[in-house]
């Protein structure tokens, strides 16, 4: 599937049930739950309540082309393409907020939000056209404006994998891509070296 939606409380996704994994019990680590599949496995792109999921599906379908030859991923735009983004300098580390600032009507739909939050992937609209976005992120802010996380300005294996899959999707559907990058290099870890 191109995009996976999971209801956060009852949905389950697994190859092997959590109890079939050696040394694991469902009470210890529920590898089939939406949180695990979105945060650790990176399989779930969107999670939420049933109403939130239905809303996310409608929103995603409204911005994507019907197929790779369709160029109907446009919408009427009343927002000025040349408007000033007065607060964008405060979004240097929080690139999800920067993308929302430059988008038509501040629209930004983040994909795989919970999987490696140091890499942002998602869709914006520019002059009515759907544009895929990839950006590294060094700061995460909650809905209340409080900083919830901080990351080094380096690329991780999981972040690169997340970006690569998103870029491949955009390429397959001829969706233009915008990249915002501010990195010093690659994350120095055994995981990075193994990959």
Annotate each language-model stretch with its function.
Residues 1-69, 175, 183-195:
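Conserved catalytic cores of soluble enzyme domains
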Residues 1-4, 13, 156-170, 177-180:
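Extended, hydrophobic alpha-helical segments in both membrane/secreted and soluble proteins
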Residues 4-6, 14, 47, 98-101, ...:
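Structured core elements
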Residues 141-146, 171, 188-195:
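C-terminal catalytic subdomain
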Residues 29-30, 106-108, 171:
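Short secondary-structure boundary micro-motifs
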Residues 34-37, 51-157, 161-164:
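Intrinsically disordered, low-complexity segments enriched in small/flexible residues
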């Amino acid at each position: 599937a191109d995009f996976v939606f999971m209801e956060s409380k009852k949905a389950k996704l697994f190859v092997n049930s959590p109890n079939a994994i050696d040394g694991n019990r469902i009470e210890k680590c529920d590898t089939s739950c939406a949180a695990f599949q979105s945060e650790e496995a990176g399989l779930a792109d969107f999670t939420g309540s049933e109403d939130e999921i239905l809303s996310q599906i409608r929103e995603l379908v409204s911005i994507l082309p019907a197929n790779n030859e369709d160029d109907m991923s446009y919408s009427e735009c009343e927002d000025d393409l040349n408007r000033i983004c007065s607060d964008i300098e405060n979004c240097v580390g929080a690139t999800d907020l920067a993308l929302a600032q430059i988008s038509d009507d501040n629209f930004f739909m983040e994909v795989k939000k919970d999987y490696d939050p140091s890499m942002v992937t998602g869709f914006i609209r520019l002059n009515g056209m759907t544009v895929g976005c990839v950006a590294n992120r060094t700061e995460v802010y909650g809905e209340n404006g409080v900083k919830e996380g901080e990351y080094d300005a380096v690329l991780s294996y999981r972040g690169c994998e997340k970006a690569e899959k998103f870029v491949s999707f955009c390429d397959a559907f001829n969706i233009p891509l915008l990249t915002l990058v501010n990195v010093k290099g690659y994350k120095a870890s055994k995981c990075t070296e193994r990959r």
